[in-house]
């Protein structure tokens, strides 16, 4: 398995910057668990547990004995792009913010994204990125849509995904991925 973690000093620098933004809710994602502070709204913690099955509530992020893989932020949806831009400027050289949609922002390591993961998988399977199809709707899909041979935007995709994609399909509520795969297979 391919795992890339933040250097602890870099992670601490990122945390220091993130903790200055009052309009966000922060979750630290580790290899063993995800972590939120005891001061996090209990309703948000309940929601987070739907997505992070191993979630620890901690007094301080300083006490985490785990490899930090990414930071997940929730913010008001209407503030997402503004916060992404603020983070992009303040985290230069440390991390890259990317919107995963609906007021969610991931803070990831530079160069470690879905396209990099597909490249690694392709290398193992001897499949070039240009032979792959990928589907996406959020900013965290952008590099992947750009790098594969056929990038497909979902109907609900963010505008930058739609302008980057080679093709389009309906949303996941109407089986958009399945319909597109069926179409590809029928054309062969």
Q: Predicted regions: what is each one?
A:
Residues 1-12:
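Glycine/small-residue-rich loop that forms an oxyanion/phosphate-binding "nest" at active or ligand-binding sites
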Residues 106-188:
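Mg2+-dependent phosphoryl-transfer enzymes with acidic/Ser/Thr/Gly-rich catalytic loops
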Residues 11-13, 17, 21-135, 139:
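Conserved acidic, metal-coordinating active-site core of Asp-based
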């Amino acid at each position: 398995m391919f795992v890339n973690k933040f250097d602890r000093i870099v992670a601490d620098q990122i945390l220091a910057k993130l903790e200055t933004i009052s309009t966000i809710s922060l979750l630290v994602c580790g290899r063993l668990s995800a972590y939120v502070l005891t001061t996090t709204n209990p309703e948000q913690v309940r929601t987070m547990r739907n997505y992070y099955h191993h979630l620890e509530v901690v007094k301080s992020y300083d006490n985490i004995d785990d490899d930090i893989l990414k930071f997940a932020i929730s913010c008001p949806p209407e503030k997402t792009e503004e916060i992404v831009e603020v983070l992009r400027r303040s985290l230069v050289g440390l991390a890259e913010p990317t919107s995963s949609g609906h007021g969610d922002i991931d803070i990831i390591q530079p160069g470690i994204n879905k396209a990099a993961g597909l490249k690694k998988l392709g290398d193992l399977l001897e499949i070039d990125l240009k032979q792959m199809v990928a589907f996406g709707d959020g900013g965290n899909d952008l590099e992947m849509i750009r790098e594969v041979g056929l990038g497909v935007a979902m109907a609900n995709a963010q505008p930058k995904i739609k302008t980057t994609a080679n093709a389009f399909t309906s949303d996941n509520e109407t089986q958009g991925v399945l319909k597109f795969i069926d179409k590809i297979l029928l054309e062969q």
